[in-house]
Amino acid sequence: VNGTRGSEVKIGNLQADGFGVFGNYSKETTTVYGNSLFDNQQVTYDNDKSKWTYSPLKFWPSDGHIDFLAYAPYDKSTKLTDGSKINNFAVSKVITDQKDLLWTNTTSSISADLTSTKENVNFHFYHALSRLGYTVKLSGNYLSKDVTFTLKKITLAGSPTDATKGAFYTSGTIDLSKQNKIGDLWSNQAGQQEFDWFSGEYIVKNSTKSHPDKVDNGNRDKSEDYLFVIPQNFSDTDGKGDKLYVIVEYDVTYNSGTKTTIHNKVYKQIKKNFEQGTAYMLNLTIGLPIEFDVDITSGVEGWGTDEEINIGSNDNNPWDGIESKK
C-alpha cells in the first residue's frame, strides 16, 4: 500500500491519488468478502465532472448483494488474502516515506425500485494507524543575550540508554472487514524499530509551543513531520510490556561573560496505549532553571540556647593563674 509522504491522507489527497476497491458478489444472506467483481479497482476523482470514476464500469446485479472493501491511497500491487486482509503492511523507517492508511467496508445491493439510475456505494474512510506529532518549548521566557537553547536531537526508542533499541512494530496485517474502533483491526504485528525524529540545530526561543520547519534548520515542515505507526500498547502496567522512551538532546549556551555550552540529554518513558485512528502530540519542555530559595521565616538556623562556660567559680573550674599587684 503506497501513501503520501510523511503527511496524513485528507480528502484532497484522496481525490488526487484515488482509492482501491475490492468487491465480492454473493447471493448468500451472509457477508462474504473477496474480489470476484472488483479486484483492487482504482477509483479516482474527475474534477471536470465533479464525481468519482473508474473504468471499466461494472453493473448492479438484479439480486444478491456486493460486499465492498476499500483502502487508500491506491497501490496497484495490493492483494487480498483470507478474503479481507492485506498482509505485511510495512512502516518505513524513513519518516518522509511513511504511509497514512485509510480503510472502510460496506455491503450494498440495488434497491427494489429497478427504475432508479443512481445507485451509489457510499464510503466513509477511517484512519488505520496512530499518528504522532511533537512540539517543543522552553520552561520560561529567558533573555537571548544571556542564554541560547538549541534543540539537537529527538529519538523514540525502546531504551533510555540505547537510542538504537527498537520500539515500534515494523509490519502487520490489516483486516479491511473490521469495524472502526473495535480493536481487532491489526494482527501479526512484528519487528521493532526506533525513529530518529529530529537531528539538527533548532533554536527554541520561548515558552510558546513550536516546531522546527525547514527554513529554521528543521528536517521537515510540521505538516510533513508526523509519524504513522501501527497501533501498539506501551502502557507497560506490569513492567513486562513493550517500552517506549522519548530521548531529547539540547545545548544550553551561556552568552554573558565567558561563553560556555553545556550539552544535555533527557528522557521520559511514554506509558500510553496508541490506538488506531487517534492522533497524539508530544509536547516537550526543555530548560529547567536552577533556582534558589531561602525560607524568609526559618531559612537561617538559630543559635539555640547558649552553652554556659563558668570560669573562676566554685564548680571545679577555677582560674588557672592569679596575679595581684599592690
Predicted segments with their positions:
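Sec-type signal peptide cleavage vicinity
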Residues: 1-326
